């Protein structure tokens, strides 16, 4: 069995490439996308349709409802499930998506034993300041408004009495994916900008606004996934703060900002990877599978 990851910024063509490669290499697919995992979040997540997926088995799509929490630990369990299936059924495994943090966790591992359900009993800024005073070296790597990571660091401190740095020294991370070849799709900025604009336009024409109205009515705005790009801007439109034209423009702008963050993360975190334009990358991947 071979396993690969296809990464790249949002709207770079990862999904289409993964489907094409999977059909030629007897592969199953694990979606590396923190939004595709949710049922009923279809248009805004740009998840492949059932028709597009065809007979290719997918893990990580439509796993939970939007009011159910899904985090990196849940993703690790999904990876184990997908890999077990691939091994039992003599399949290859393609991991594809833009949530680089999940992929990083697969490669580097997570320290186990912390109760993920411990929540902040003080504000995010207060928790950050407290942790910074105790462990400046670790907290310098976290943005002050990054609620998820501040909450995790705070949970470590509350449960163990140790600073994150000391905790990770005593509980080294255990990597899960050890032989994972990473392929990255590259695009020129202006070309990607056109792709993002086109995808945003297609989303709106396909019923994005109606989808968000439905999701809000059923789940409210409270779940973490309801703060995703495409959803928050639509809430602004529904609140009368944006025109339809401004909605489309703002989603595209925020998507490009996300693409920049993804590219920066991929560049800094995944050093041993093959990067190429999409047409050439297709050939690179097929060559790897033929070795």
Curated annotation (Swiss-Prot):
What EC class does the entry list?
Answer: transferase
Task: List the residues marked with site Interaction with substrate tRNA.
Answer: 99
In terms of InterPro entries, this protein maps to: Dimethylallyltransferase, IPT, P-loop_NTPase
For this protein, the record's SUPFAM superfamilies field holds: P-loop containing nucleoside triphosphate hydrolases
Listed GO biological process terms: tRNA modification
Instruction: Provide any one GO MF term from the record.
Output: tRNA dimethylallyltransferase activity
What are the start and end residues of every segment in region (Interaction with substrate tRNA)? 33-36
Query: Known EC number(s)?
Result: 2.5.1.75
Residues the record lists as binding substrate: 10-15
Specify which residues bind ATP according to the UniProt entry for this protein: 8-15
What's the catalysed reaction? Answer: adenosine(37) in tRNA + dimethylallyl diphosphate = N(6)-dimethylallyladenosine(37) in tRNA + diphosphate
Give the required cofactors: Mg(2+)
Q: Which PANTHER family match?
A: TRNA DIMETHYLALLYLTRANSFERASE
Question: What does this gene product do?
Answer: Catalyzes the transfer of a dimethylallyl group onto the adenine at position 37 in tRNAs that read codons beginning with uridine, leading to the formation of N6-(dimethylallyl)adenosine (i(6)A).
**Protein name per the record:** tRNA dimethylallyltransferase
